Amino acid sequence: MLRLVGYDARSQILEVVFNTGGTYQYKEVPASEYERLMSSESIGQYMHRHIIDRYDYERIN
């Protein structure tokens, strides 16, 4: 599902590249949320349950 995940703590932007090729930036994601994402058993499931429908986002490609 996910190819790459990056996070900028200063701007609180979570950037995700999906296997389908789409790159999305999720806005105002707290560092604690990013930490939970990265330590979760399944990053894909965590994205669906806690991030995708809860944070504003923009597709950048």
Task: Locate each region found by the language model.
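Acidic/histidine-enriched, beta-strand-rich ligand/metal-binding domains
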Residues: 1-61
